[in-house]
């Protein structure tokens, strides 16, 4: 068995068969080299020797062939190699490879007659070793800058990736490490996270990392730089060990750019994520980006994880730098960046060699294209858009056809031709029911819908399996995306009822995909009836019965058809170890509904319901014929990945799907051969049973039982895990409920005491209120009596002043009259008039002061009238104040009645104070009224 060893300067491949060397006419002619390889391989015999092939790591090296004793049989410079080739994968030369080189007979001569072209042919026991040998040649050709090898330096780095989650609150965060198993982080959605990267240098002289100016994150792998999103840096410093640099950044997964990493993933699904850090190294003239890939599984926000052993996600990097050749500036000690390669990239490059075609050019490695960034991820079931466009005349034709079909029991002859272009999506539900004869089922079993509702209320032993499957069914479709949403509820009901209705088959994994396709076009009851009709009348349930014997029969038939119609592909699949069940099991059990886009799923169901079970063979052969060119170039792992990932992606458009359907229908398949293959399969099985050793049969039976036991144990472990998780969740909810009950009881007790205190306080307030009310009533009565008395006094004063005013006016008028009469009489008397004038002039002031004259009396009377007017004004103001006091008292009374149960003593004291102020103001007015009383 050959082996290969990777040293510093060369790679050695031991135990390689050297088939020989022969001259070539044209060293670039691959057909000539293949023919020579075939001849040497067929002529190999006992003279074939095992050698050690030594391949250098740079273009200036020498290729050597060393025998078992260590003697160099042949050697030639790598630069003389002109071409590398590998044997056809479908032939026995699959493990062979050859190299052509040019040999000069005489040094210094350049004409073609002095140049000899030769080809060395080798054979290995494994095809992978041949691919790795050619990779070594390719790697050597890529290292063309030989002169700088002595100036190059290699440094080894190790990066450790950790993810922390906030297990506390926003105000009091509690950061805990996310558990991970086999490189898969277990994270919870909608929780703030921190990404921590520890970059450690493990080889080479210590480089000084100055800082990290950015950490980037994105979902997926093999991403472009523009796909990564910058995170907010939180920590950026050298650790306790000088060789370790720690970078920490905050990550909010609720941002729409990280929606993929914040969406709950089904149980068997993982999400790739890429973390990159850009660092600046003092000794290097440009920044360096370290990129890591990891996987994560997103759980519910309140998921609880078991304590698992703390492991780390790490990646090793090889950094190649080059010393500067310019010694003019001794202070310039900067190193030039050459390359940075991770161990994962190196291993992935070597593994991809096994998937190479037979002709292997020297440029074996190429970067991933922009359109291949998601090629490693399979399509989610239920993905793709379904065209809703349909011409009006085409739709009218379908409506007329359906109307005639409803009136007649026979299927229209035109339906088979129309189905080839697909049924209009708006009419698929009705047409599918007509194609499957659901109305006949309603006649044969009129109580089927009633049974559906009866089974809904009955317990189901497959409930746990169904619940797990519905989360994996069409997760890319909006109708089934929401957990416990309307779509998942309907899907759960149909799956549960069918498992109870068909006790022999019960529930089988994959049944939910077909049910989901029906639910997208019809209500629950109609979808269930259609599912029953498909399972029983189309023979689909037979595939699930009796240990899947009928399914193995279909595999045998498909294998035989593949040998008849596509023999080269059949031979290739058989050669690399691909069996039919590895890729066709889902095709038969789910009718292509699990992996392919919805547009293709509906087209296939249209054809299946119209043509029957043989449709699966037509579609399968059409798919394999379409993929023939690609499959012939792939190995075992590449083929399985192609069926899982690449094949469904080819039919994401309506045009490609229609092309496949037409190709499948036009595939000239002899259906009578299916019966022949069935009889042959039964005969083979009968011979196997007759010739089988009882011990082997028992061993197989034991193995089958052990497999079932392991499966049941895994299911039991899953159920136990779910049970423990449920118990923990219920315990948590119970603790929360008990805490809430205790808190509520304490609150009720506290409120009861407060209520009793408030009731007692209310009683006291009511008593005080009644007392205040009685005091107020007495004060109001007293004030009213004082007011009425003041009014009476005022009326008497008015009357008295009025009488005095009238009498004074009369006396004044009488005095004036008498005065005028006297003056008139004595005015002509010269003797009396001077005496009168003298008398008027010398009249005694005491007399005039003590004896008021008429004008004095009038003046006093006017003063009295003014005083009376002032008293009237004061009285009016007093009445106004009284009215205001009464209004205020009424307002206070209303407030006291409305708030007596909620307000405390402060408000009541304030009210009493206001009442006292009103009472004192009234008393003040009363005293002022009394002071003006004569």
UniProtKB/Swiss-Prot annotation:
Q: What is the effect of changing residue 490 to P?
A: In qbc24; males are sterile. Disrupts seam cell division and alae formation. Disrupts the localization of alg-1 to endomembranes, and instead alg-1 accumulates in the perinuclear region
- The protein depicted here goes by the name Rab GTPase-activating protein tbc-11
Q: Where is this region: Disordered?
A: 337-383
Biological-process GO terms, alphabetical:
cuticle development; RNA localization
* Effect of gene knockout: RNAi-mediated knockdown results in increased expression of the lin-41 protein, which is a target of the let-7 microRNA.
- One short Pfam name that applies is DUF3694
Polar residues composition bias: which ranges?
351-361
Q: Which SMART domains match?
A: PTB, TBC
Q: Which residues form a coiled coil?
A: 727-800, 861-895
What molecular functions are annotated in GO for this chain?
GTPase activator activity; small GTPase binding
Native source organism of the sequence:
Caenorhabditis elegans
Instruction: State what this protein does.
Output: Rab GTPase activating protein for the small GTPases rab-6.1 and rab-6.2. Probably acts through rab-6.1 and rab-6.2 to play a role in microRNA-mediated gene silencing in different tissue types. Required for seam cell division and alae formation.
**Segments forming domain PID:** 16-134
InterPro entries, per the entry: Kinesin-like, PH-like_dom_sf, PTB/PI_dom, Rab-GAP-TBC_dom, Rab-GAP_TBC_sf, Rab_GAP_TBC_domain
Domain named Rab-GAP TBC: residues: 422-612
Keywords assigned by UniProt?
Coiled coil, GTPase activation
Q: What highest taxon heads this organism's lineage?
A: Eukaryota
* KW Coiled coil (keyword) present: yes
């Amino acid at each position: 068995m050959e082996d290969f060893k990777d040293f510093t300067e060369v790679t050695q491949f031991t135990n390689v068969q050297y088939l020989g060397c022969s001259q070539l006419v044209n060293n670039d002619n691959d057909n000539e080299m293949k023919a020579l390889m075939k001849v040497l391989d067929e002529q190999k015999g006992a003279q074939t020797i095992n050698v050690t092939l030594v391949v250098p790591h740079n273009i200036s090296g020498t290729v050597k062939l060393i025998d078992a004793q260590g003697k160099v049989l042949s050697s030639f410079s790598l630069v003389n190699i002109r071409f590398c080739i590998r044997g056809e994968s479908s032939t026995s030369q699959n493990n062979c490879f050859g190299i052509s080189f040019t040999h000069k007979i005489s040094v210094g001569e350049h004409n073609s007659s002095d140049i000899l072209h030769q080809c060395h042919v080798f054979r290995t026991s494994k095809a992978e070793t041949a691919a790795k040998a050619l990779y070594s040649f390719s790697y050597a050709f890529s290292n063309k800058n030989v002169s700088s090898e002595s100036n190059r330096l290699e440094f080894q780095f190790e990066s450790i990736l950790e993810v922390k989650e906030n297990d506390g609150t926003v105000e009091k965060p509690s950061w805990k490490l996310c558990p991970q198993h086999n490189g898969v982080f277990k994270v919870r959605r909608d929780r703030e996270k921190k990404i921590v990267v520890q970059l450690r240098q493990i080889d080479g002289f210590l480089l000084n990392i100055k800082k990290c100016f950015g950490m980037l994150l994105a979902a997926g792998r093999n991403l472009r730089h523009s796909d990564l999103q910058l995170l907010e840096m939180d920590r950026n410093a050298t650790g306790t060990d000088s060789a370790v640099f720690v970078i920490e950044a905050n990550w909010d997964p609720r941002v729409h750019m990280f929606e993929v990493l914040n969406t709950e993933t089904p149980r068997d699904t993982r999400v790739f994520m890429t973390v990159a850090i850009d660092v600046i190294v003092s000794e290097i003239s440009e920044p360096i980006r370290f990129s890591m890939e990891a996987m994560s599984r997103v759980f519910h926000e309140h998921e609880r994880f078991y304590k698992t052993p703390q492991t780390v996600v790490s990646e090793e990097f090889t950094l190649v730098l080059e010393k500067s050749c310019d010694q003019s500036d001794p202070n310039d000690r900067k190193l030039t960046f050459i390359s940075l390669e991770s161990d994962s990239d190196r291993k992935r490059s070597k593994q991809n060699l096994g998937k190479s075609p037979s002709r292997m050019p020297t440029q074996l490695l190429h970067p991933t294209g922009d359109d291949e960034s998601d090629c490693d991820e399979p399509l989610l079931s239920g993905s793709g858009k379904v065209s809703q466009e349909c011409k009006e005349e085409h739709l009218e034709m379908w409506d007329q056809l359906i109307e005639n079909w409803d009136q007649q029991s026979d299927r229209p002859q035109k339906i088979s031709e129309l189905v080839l272009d697909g049924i209009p999506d708006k009419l698929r539900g009705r047409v599918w029911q007509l194609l499957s004869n659901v109305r006949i089922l309603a006649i044969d079993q009129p109580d089927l819908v009633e049974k559906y509702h009866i089974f809904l209320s009955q317990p189901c032993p497959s409930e746990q399996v169904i619940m797990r499957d519905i989360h994996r069914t069409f997760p890319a479709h909006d109708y089934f995306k929401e957990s416990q949403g309307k779509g998942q509820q309907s899907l759960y009901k149909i799956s549960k009822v069918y498992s109870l209705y068909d006790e022999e088959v019960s529930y089988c994994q994959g049944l939910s995909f077909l049910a989901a396709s029906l639910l997208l076009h019809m209500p629950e009851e109609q979808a269930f009836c259609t599912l029953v009709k498909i399972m029983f009348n189309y023979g689909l349930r037979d595939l699930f019965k009796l240990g899947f014997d009928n399914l193995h029969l279909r595999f045998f038939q498909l294998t035989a058809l593949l040998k008849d119609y596509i023999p080269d592909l059949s031979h290739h699949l058989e050669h690399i170890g691909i069996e039919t069940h590895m890729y066709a099991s889902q095709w038969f059990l789910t009718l292509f509904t699990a992996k392919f886009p919805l547009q293709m799923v509906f087209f296939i169901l249209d054809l299946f319901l119209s043509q029957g079970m043989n449709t699966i063979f037509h579609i399968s052969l059409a798919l394999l014929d379409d993929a023939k060119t690609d499959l012939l170039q792939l190995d075992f792992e590449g083929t399985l990945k192609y069926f899982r990932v690449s094949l469904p992606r080819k039919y994401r458009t309506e045009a490609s799907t229609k092309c496949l359907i037409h190709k499948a229908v036009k595939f000239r398949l002899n259906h009578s051969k299916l019966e022949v293959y069935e009889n042959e399969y039964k005969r083979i099985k009968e011979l196997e049973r007759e010739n089988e050793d009882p011990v082997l049969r028992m061993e197989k039976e034991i193995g089958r039982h052990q497999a079932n036991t392991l499966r049941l144990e895994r299911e039991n472990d899953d159920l136990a895990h779910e049970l423990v998780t449920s118990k923990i969740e219920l315990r948590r909810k119970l603790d929360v409920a008990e805490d809430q009950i205790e808190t509520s009881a304490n609150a009720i007790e506290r409120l009861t005491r407060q209520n009793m205190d408030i009731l007692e306080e209310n009683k006291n307030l009511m008593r005080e209120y009644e007392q205040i009310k009685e005091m107020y009533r007495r004060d109001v009565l007293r004030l009213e009596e004082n007011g009425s008395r003041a009014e009476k006094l005022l009326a008497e004063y008015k009357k008295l002043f009025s009488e005095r005013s009238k009498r004074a006016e009369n006396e004044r008028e009488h005095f004036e009259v008498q005065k005028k009469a006297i003056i008139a009489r004595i005015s002509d008397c010269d003797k009396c008039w001077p005496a009168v004038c003298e008398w008027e002039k010398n009249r005694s002031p005491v007399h005039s002061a003590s004896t008021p004259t008429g004008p004095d009396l009038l003046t006093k009377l006017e003063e009295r009238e003014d005083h009376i007017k002032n008293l009237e004004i004061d009285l009016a103001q007093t009445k106004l104040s009284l009215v205001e006091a009464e209004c205020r008292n009424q307002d206070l009374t209303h407030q006291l009645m409305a708030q007596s149960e909620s307000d405390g003593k402060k408000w009541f004291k304030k009210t009493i104070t206001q009442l006292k102020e009103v009472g004192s103001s009234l008393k003040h007015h009363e005293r002022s009224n009394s002071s003006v009383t004569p």
